[in-house]
Regions:
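Internal intein/HINT superfamily modules and their associated LAGLIDADG
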Residues: 1-285
Length: 285
């Protein structure tokens, strides 16, 4: 019952969210795109799963410009898209926000080149200071975009039930952003991170009980996620609680964690009825 209350409270927060500039900068560094080469029309966009439609509307209200539209991709999947073409809004709102709050080297380089190509008044934007402390709100926005909360279940002979359960917090970035991930791990998570690599991607992972219980859980309890990822976190906390109580070493505890993983999948794709109607309308055009 307490978990359901938390999930419903999280839904209400998303629909009445107060966007902070540092959060938005972190979210843009994870999910934003700067379009248009020199000589082309510049524009900026963010796209998200339709479940985050209300949050995207809050972003459009923050910039006091434009509307969020639903788009259906060639593969049939729908997404909520917010695009800014207005050069005035780009120059007077997007550029100041990003130049003052960006942290990521890769996105900052893209943003810098895009700005130099289209806006004569912004020819000397400095790259972020690698020694500057990261704002917690920036990290929340970045994790709302590129972070993950999940559990791993491995077959093993080391446990009586035949399975080992691990809860994981993960942020994935290109190889070139390992320095940024190290800064995040050292500043916020007590240097408890481990590393994993897949193709050209680095994964900062917190898997130790110390790191999860003493750093990750309290940080995101205090600094709320704004996307549907908050549901992932709340359900992940229940998995972590099961492990803290050593219930995961029993078959009933293992089943509980599997049920919580299924709930995560449900809440990731659960869309309010009004948004579903808009998607259906799009698909039936």
């Amino acid at each position: 019952m307490e978990l359901l209350k938390s999930l419903e409270h999280s839904r209400a927060i998303q629909e009445n969210v107060n966007i902070k500039p540092q959060w938005l900068a972190g979210f843009i560094e994870a999910e934003g795109h700067f379009h248009g080469k020199a000589g082309q029309q510049p524009h900026f966009s963010i796209s998200q799963h339709p479940a985050d439609f209300k949050l995207m509307e809050s972003i459009s209200k923050y910039f006091d410009h434009g509307k969020v539209r639903l788009s259906v991709r060639p593969d049939g999947r729908s997404e909520a898209v917010y695009t800014i073409y207005s050069k005035d809004v780009l120059e007077n709102k997007i550029i100041p926000l990003c130049s003052e709050n960006f942290i990521s080297t890769n996105k900052s380089l893209q943003f810098r080149e895009w700005t130099k190509a289209h806006f004569p008044n912004y020819q000397s934007i400095a790259l972020p200071d690698p020694n500057k402390k990261i704002d917690p709100n920036w990290l929340v926005g970045f994790v709302d975009g590129d972070g993950s909360f999940y559990s791993l279940i491995h077959k093993t002979k080391d446990y009586k039930i035949g399975y080992q359960v691990q809860t994981v917090f993960d942020i994935a970035q290109l190889d070139s952003e390992r320095g940024l991930l190290t800064r995040i791990g050292d500043q916020f998570f007590g240097s408890t991170q481990t590393w994993a690599k897949s193709k050209d991607t680095q994964h900062l992972r917190i898997m130790s009980k110390n790191g999860l219980v003493n750093y990750v859980e309290p940080f995101f309890d205090e600094n709320k996620l704004l996307t549907r990822k908050e549901y992932d976190f709340l359900l992940w906390k229940e998995m972590l609680k099961t492990i803290k109580n050593k219930e995961h070493t029993t078959l009933s505890g293992l089943e509980k964690i599997k049920e919580l993983r299924d709930l995560q999948n449900f809440y990731r794709s659960n869309i309010s009825s009004d948004i579903q109607k808009l998607i259906d309308k799009k698909l039936n055009k």
